[in-house]
Curated annotation (Swiss-Prot):
Sample GO molecular function, one term: peptide-methionine (S)-S-oxide reductase activity
Listed EC numbers: 1.8.4.11
Gene Ontology BP terms: protein modification process
Top-rank EC class of the record's enzyme: oxidoreductase
Name of this protein: Peptide methionine sulfoxide reductase MsrA
NCBIfam families membership: msrA
Gene3D superfamilies assigned: Peptide methionine sulphoxide reductase MsrA (3.30.1060.10)
Length: 177
């Protein structure tokens, strides 16, 4: 089979990264930025809300163990796709819900997945997740990579990241590492 990569943004990348790293079959997760117009943005640039970029993660996974839909299922479980430009305490377009497909097949699969969630009334509100083709992914600085692993006792991590990691372990127990 091989590996594939999914690029997703659902609020602060520290949260999404830590949640995705729990999933068996995920071989690498990189925090970064995508979806905007500014070339090679810094964290400070993206946090200003003026770059058009969202905080995202690139999730590399083994297709013998996971399907794209499995990654999407975890993604939609650990963030609220019904709020515009917000996830928990983080507010701004850089925290929007976005799926950035790498090709037409991923675009079709992401659209079908969101349509199924909407048809099932899986959430209390309408899903506002953007689905836009990935143009360029910019990795974040090293200090943002594996942030939860490096800083599990930081206040933001204990309040925001840890509950998402716990949720993945509880809901996807057999599929976590």
């Amino acid at each position: 089979m091989g590996t594939e990569t999914a690029t997703l943004g659902g609020g602060c990348f520290w949260c999404t990264e830590a949640a995705m790293e729990e999933l068996a079959g995920v071989t690498d997760v990189t925090s970064g930025y995508a979806g905007g117009d500014t070339a090679d943005p810094s964290y400070r640039d993206v946090c200003s809300g003026t770059t058009g970029h969202a905080e995202v993660v690139q999730v590399e996974y083994d297709t013998a163990e996971l399907a794209y839909e499995d990654v999407l299922e975890v993604f939609f479980t650990v963030h609220d796709p019904t709020t515009v430009d917000r996830e928990g305490p983080d507010v701004g377009s850089q925290y929007r819900s976005i799926v950035l497909p790498h090709d037409d097949q991923q675009h079709e699969r992401a659209t079908a997945f969101v349509d199924e969630l909407a048809a099932a009334d899986a959430f209390d509100g309408s899903i506002v997740t953007e689905i836009e083709p990935l143009e360029t992914f910019y990795p974040a600085a090293e200090k943002h990579q594996n942030y939860f692993e490096k800083n599990p006792d930081a206040a933001y991590c204990t309040v925001n990241v840890a509950p998402k990691v716990s949720k993945v372990r509880e809901q996807f127990g057999a599929r976590t590492e």
